[in-house]
Amino acid sequence: MTLCISLSARPSNNGTRFHNHLYEQLGLNWIYKAFAPTDLAQAIAGVRGLGIRGCAVSMPYKEDVIALVDVMDPSAKAIDSVNTIVNDGGRLTAYNTDYTAIEQLLKRNAVPTHYSVLLRGSGGMAKATAAALRDAGFKDVTIVARNQASGKELADLYGFKWSAGLPPADAGGRADMIINVTPVGMAGGRDADSLSFPQDAVEAAQVVFDVVALPAETPLIKAGRAAGKTVITGAEVATIQALEQFVLYTGIRPTDEQVRAAEEFTRAQ
């Protein structure tokens, strides 16, 4: 049996259900398990030593894990952020499939590249999102991050603006698209019931995007739907990036029908 795992501060069963359902459909003798490591270095050593084929990496480990792998694929090296590790006989290669997910969702929703964007966050997922925005042709992007060092560094890297906080909508704190890449709104967190953007920013936006996948409807997504906005959810991000991980681990690309079945199974649980 081949084992794949995920490492996260707050593990969910979504990835586990998605991957395991695909394994079952394809008749693979594989299994996927989710873990919350107490020591990241020891966990990665376990991936190497136990022959674990694949390892998904979630917040807050996407940057810390870089020092623990052997090879950085260009998808991860370009943005210094890792969400996927593939183990080939003890040699660990890091990838980033978050970028692919963001890129595909911007295209799928036909978000105009002239839209102004407020991107809240400056961690590993923010790096993937900023890179996807830049490569898609977005110019008017403001990184909103309390951490001045990481926020300004990210903004400078992609030629964007930086702000330490969100001013009121009538004082510039509005944009055509707002994107949350922080844990605000994540189930189980201290800010699980909080809006990651003020209500007036939601009202002013055309597109409301939250990368938080658990719950499927975060407070921000609920507010966006209620206001009649186009919403892009973390669950959508999770499905696409997990599918690309599956391909990296197995070398198999499931059919659209198989992916839909895995999505439906995941949502039904």
Predicted regions and their residues:
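Phosphate/diphosphate ligand-binding glycine-rich loop within oxidoreductases
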Residues: T2-N109, P215-E217
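Hydrophobic Val/Ile/Leu positions in short beta-strands of Rossmann-like dinucleotide-binding domains
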Residues: S6, L119-R120, I143, D210
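Conserved beta-strand positions in the Rossmann-like core of class I SAM-dependent methyltransferases
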Residues: K33, V141-T142, I232
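Glycine-rich adenosine-cofactor-binding loop
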Residues: N96, L106, A110-F138, A145
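Conserved S-adenosyl-L-methionine
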Residues: D135-D140, A226-T230
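NAD(P)-binding Rossmann-fold cofactor-contacting core
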Residues: F138-Y158
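Rossmann-like adenosine-cofactor binding region
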Residues: F160-V231
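Adenosine-phosphate binding glycine-rich loop
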Residues: V207, V211-Q269
